[in-house]
Amino acid sequence: MSCTHSSHNLFVLFLLVFHSVSSGQQKPLTWPNALKQDPEWFSSREALRIADNLLIYQRDAGGWPKNTDMAVVLTDADKSKLLAEKKQNDSTIDNSSTYTQLSFLARAFTAQQQRRHADAYFKGLDYLLKAQYANGGWPQFYPDLEGYYKHITYNDDAMIGVMKLLRDIAAKKPEYLFVDDARRKKAAVAVEKGIECILKTQIVVDGKKTVWCAQHDEVTLAPAAARKFELVSLSGGESVGIVRFLMSIDKPSPDVVASIKAAIAWFEKSKLTGIKWVAVPDPTKIHGFDRVVVKDPTAGPLWARFYDIKTNRPIFVGRDSVVHYDVAEIEDERRNGYAWYVDSAADLLSNDYPRWLTKHGN
């Protein structure tokens, strides 16, 4: 092979590799990554494309469905199918739905001033305001209020995600300056009602305030069950987001201060030490691994996702709804497919709470 021919082949190979890398860089963002972009990016054509996607995915009720990558490139056939689904009754705040779409649309409109994005935004904001119960809580789904969908939902930070959005609107954060005063005032009122609901749903055990259940009854405000493995309990996971939200209040009332301190006391009391929750590769398991608890005296603190309200013991539940006190006793599919232990309260105790105390006094 001649040197010239070899050089030519190398040059062609270089072009192919360069094109491949460049093309990889141009791949459309996923929806989670689109939410993480800098403000400057929202002036881009890609941001415009994704914002227009959101208009197609938006339901007639005003909200959005969950578990969908709304940043994908849609074909004409995709668009036709989605437009035909607009009447579906699956608008939800579960799994970071609706409030994240509204956050994206606000940033897109602020950057590009496309009126259609503002119109969709206001429709979604009105949906959230309408979905709020008179007692201040939000259901997981609206207007579909079947089964546990109707419960006030803290699970996976659903209600807290909505309240953060409304708080930022009320506070006139830069990306929400286009919101009219009437809606801004409604957002502020909704946040205050939400805070009242949080305070009223904090579970009291033996005369002491503790934390919250992942769901609460929309009428009685009592802790409520959801799926078969999500029973009435004290939540070591969702309660972290609730406390952080309460800590973000600039001028907390005495009731808010008392709520925070009581929850922190519960987290201190309920932490689990000397253990790790690890995934061990195991091809015989459904997920390809098995999660097990191992002893480790150097491990940082953990909290169970759920605690028995009366005894404060960690509980673990499979799809048969039978309570176990050892995670190893529930079936493979649930044991390895759910976050039974969490460590999110560690930073709350070691960093967030001390800073809050410094700001608001002992």
Ranges and model annotations:
Residues A118, F122-L125, L129, E146, ...:
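Eukaryote-skewed repeat-based solenoidal scaffolds used as protein-protein interaction platforms
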Residues R49-G62, A120-G137, A188-G207, S259-K276:
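Long, well-ordered core segments of solenoidal/helical folds
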Residues Q25-I50, D168-K193, V219-A226, E230, ...:
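Terminal, non-catalytic domain-edge segments
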Residues S44, L48-F104:
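N-terminal carbohydrate-binding/catalytic regions of secreted carbohydrate-active enzymes
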Residues L35-S43, L82-S97, E146-M159, A225-E238:
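Solvent-exposed loop and edge beta-strand segments that line ligand/cofactor-binding
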Residues Y57, A108-A111, A131, I169-K172, ...:
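Residue-level signature of the C-terminal ends
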Residues M1-Q26:
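Bacterial Sec-dependent N-terminal signal peptides
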Residues W64-P65, D69-A71, D78-E85, A134-L145, ...:
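Intrinsic, low-complexity N-terminal interaction/targeting segments
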